[in-house]
């Protein structure tokens, strides 16, 4: 029976929700009858551009038919699920109509593999050509490249898209062989290498590229994951690595049970560590190593690093370099800028930092101001960590309805 456009949209938007390269919510509160609003992470989602703008995207698969049988994927060949596929004209028409109604500002397009990699990529390319050349659509387009597709097809897709990606999914070749035998790391990364080389040859602004790693489906530790991310960044292959806490959708002896909860906190810590790699000049083996191969879920990665390296602390806030300031837990790039600017005129103390609107809730355990260290806890790893995890409870004071000092003087309420 032929499916309507509405049915196809329902199926293919829902099938795309597990790709976190574009997602607007980590919540699973679904729509309830009689209530307003929902937090679905499928359909229209949000992402951020390089200049910080938040854009709404239609997040959808071209098709959820697939010749692959990856154990972790809801769209695997052996799963008995509802299947659908757009044709290029249908997808282009939906996108342009959503855009004209101001529902979206762009398109996030992924796909299962139908027939073979080249055939699927050609269908996607045809949809992009209709959008860009026929409809003159100049909005944002993010396309998932199909590993194994021909280089010439990829070149055309890259010329029409704003961002491309190819998901590695699993951090090691061993796990890929076990759970996704049709894929290898080299095969997945090859389209991104093509895209990078094409951008460099044309001497234009390099196209943004990203990948996704699933966290918690296989036994790899955080060191394995961050090492891979670091290598990909160092090779200038990627602008961003996304981490996706594994959501069990299939029963498989090689995967966690379906009732297993996604490791969301671990995913969050990996994103924080990834930020340190990209913007704070940390190396992966500074954050995690053979002795501590996994991040501490109780504290953020910068605090975790600081607690393992107390020999560098406490740092004197008035004399240390910009690079050293960036390594102090709780002080970010904007805080460092404020400190460097302010200390040109005076030596700073703890009160000065508060006046600069710099939170010292964590930083105070790792710094001195004018040679003075905070007196709340002793300078030991265990006591500092405990103080950070379990801060002292503040005494709750009932706020007064009136300004008591003013009332006492004037007699007014």
Annotate each language-model stretch with its function.
Residues 58-60, 89-100:
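Short, charged beta->alpha transition segments
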Residues 60-89:
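Canonical Radical SAM [4Fe-4S] cluster-binding loop centered on the CxxxCxxC motif
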Residues 92, 96, 115-287:
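Conserved AdoMet/S-adenosylmethionine-binding subsite of the radical SAM
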Residues 342-343:
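Residue-level signature of tetratricopeptide-repeat
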Residues 57, 70, 109, 166, ...:
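Conserved, mostly hydrophobic/aromatic
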Residues 254-326, 362-413:
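Long, highly charged, low-complexity intrinsically disordered interaction regions
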């Amino acid at each position: 029976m032929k499916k309507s456009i509405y049915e196809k949209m329902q199926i293919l938007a829902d099938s795309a929700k597990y790709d976190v390269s574009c997602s607007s919510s980590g919540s699973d509160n679904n729509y309830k009858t009689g209530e307003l609003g929902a937090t679905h992470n499928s359909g229209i989602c949000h992402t951020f551009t390089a200049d910080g703008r938040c854009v709404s995207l239609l997040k959808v698969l071209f098709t959820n038919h697939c010749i692959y049988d990856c154990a972790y994927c809801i769209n695997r060949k052996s799963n008995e699920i509802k299947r659908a596929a757009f044709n290029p004209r249908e997808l282009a028409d939906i996108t342009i109509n959503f855009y004209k109604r101001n529902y979206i500002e762009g398109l996030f397009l992924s796909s299962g593999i139908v027939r073979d990699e080249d055939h699927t990529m050609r269908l996607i390319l045809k949809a992009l050509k209709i959008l860009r050349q026929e409809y003159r659509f100049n909005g944002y387009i993010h396309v998932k490249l199909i590993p194994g597709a021909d280089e010439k097809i990829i070149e055309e897709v890259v010329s029409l898209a704003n961002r491309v990606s190819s998901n590695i999914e699993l951090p090691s070749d061993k796990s890929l062989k076990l759970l996704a035998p049709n894929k290898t790391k080299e095969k997945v990364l090859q389209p991104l290498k093509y895209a990078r080389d094409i951008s460099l040859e044309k001497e234009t602004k390099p196209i943004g590229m990203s990948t996704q790693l699933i966290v918690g489906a296989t036994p790899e530790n955080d060191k394995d994951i961050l090492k891979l991310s670091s290598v990909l960044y160092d090779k200038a292959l990627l602008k961003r690595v996304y981490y996706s806490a594994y959501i069990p959708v299939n029963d498989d002896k090689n995967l966690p049970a379906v009732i297993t909860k996604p490791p969301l906190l671990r995913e969050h810590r990996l994103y924080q560590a990834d930020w340190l790699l990209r913007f704070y000049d940390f190396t992966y083996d500074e954050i995690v190593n053979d002795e501590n191969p996994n991040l501490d879920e109780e504290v953020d990665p910068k605090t975790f690093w600081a607690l393992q390296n107390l020999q560098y602390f406490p740092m004197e806030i008035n004399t240390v370099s910009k690079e050293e300031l960036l390594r102090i837990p709780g002080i970010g790039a904007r805080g460092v800028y404020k400190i460097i600017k302010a200390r040109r005129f005076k030596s700073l103390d703890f009160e000065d930092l508060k006046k600069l609107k710099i939170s010292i809730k964590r930083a105070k355990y790792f710094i001195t101001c004018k040679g003075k260290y905070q007196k709340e806890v002793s300078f030991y790893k265990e006591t500092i960590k405990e103080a950070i995890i379990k801060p002292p409870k503040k005494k709750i004071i009932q706020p007064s309805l009136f300004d008591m000092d003013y009332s006492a003087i004037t007699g007014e309420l």
